[in-house]
Amino acid sequence: MKHYNIPIFIAYFGCPNKCVFCNQNKITGIETNIQPEEVKGIIDEYLCTLPSYGEKELAFFGGTFTAISIPLQKEFLSVAKEFIDKGLIKGIRLSTRPDNIDLNIVKMLKEYGVTTVELGVQSLDNKVLSLSERGYRKEEVERAVKLLKDFQIEVGIQIMPGLPGSSFKSDLQTVKEVIEMKPNFTRVYPTLVISDTKLEKMFKNNEFVPLSLDEAVDLTSVIIAVLENCKIPIIRVGLQPSEDIREEGVIVAGPFHPAFRELCESNIYRLFFEEKLITCEKIIVKVSHRDVSRVSGIRGSNKKYFGKRLEIIVDETIEKGSFYLNNQKYCRENLLKNVLRVVLNEADNN
């Protein structure tokens, strides 16, 4: 069934501290001081334009919702609850910090119809959390996830590879520990240096070196493979290119690309083709038109990389996610297992 989010942006609203990487107004492209009475109008407007079919959720994005005062939380939630009770929306989703979740808050969220909570976890390495000035430890994340799951509230986890003090190994360890928590979905945002943040000062003082684009693509390709192999959905990879964040000077440094996930997907194919070309001079790939852009790479990057050694044929009879290489059929699972084998072996040898 088609799913629709009705977004309410509460950038910076409720956030109790300012982490080294965060300038939320720049990241969301929205600066707001929204009031509860405005929420009803926004919902009504969206419901007028959205199709009558499909599931609809109200989504409070951008802030630390559960750090808002309890009375104000209830004001926001009660507006949405009216629409839930009328059957017009399915539920409410919101984002918050792990250290702003406790038993009383979770009970309240459940009472008002909250169905999904996204936690800005970022890392499960306590050293990285400290250097990023997150203000909590891994143990608080584990406690928050358990509490939410105990009340049958879906949990999303956001992680940020490439934070201060992190490494390829520590970021993968974070992913493995996230998997153990069994979230309903994840988001992966490689760390960017945004203007007017402490991280910008650290970068300019040579105290922090962000991942290069190639490093971020290689690391994130592995993260995608690990999460997908464990059947954990990844609903976004890379920061969404809002109008504001693409303004000159907003992104100071770091691996930003407007189609970052597509870079990772193309890289996953490239690694697979490289392995096959060890034992043959040329490969002929037959693929669905729905996958050909990833096989070819952004702006034909894979075709340029392999040259005449790679021939791509579009075949409308092939289902999405499968392809034939020199007449042998492969699927997504083959691609992901190859990434894990190749990249992790390289990491072990370095």
Regions found by a protein language model. Name each.
Residues 10-14, 189-194, 240:
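Short glycine-enriched loops at secondary-structure junctions
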Residues 15-19, 194-201, 245-247:
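Short acidic/His/Gly/Ser-rich catalytic and metal-binding motifs that mark active-site loops
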Residues 2-4, 209-350:
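Auxiliary Fe-S-binding modules of radical SAM enzymes
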Residues 27-41, 49, 62-217:
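Conserved non-cysteine loop/helix-boundary elements of the Radical SAM core domain that shape
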Residues 41-51, 221, 225:
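A short, N-terminal amphipathic alpha-helix
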Residues 54-58, 90-92, 283:
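Residue-level recognition of the N-termini of beta-strands and the immediately preceding loop/turn
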Residues 2-38:
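Canonical Radical SAM [4Fe-4S] cluster-binding loop centered on the CxxxCxxC motif
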Residues 47-54, 277-280:
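Phosphate/pyrophosphate-binding loops at sites that engage ATP/ADP/AMP, CoA/4′-phosphopantetheine
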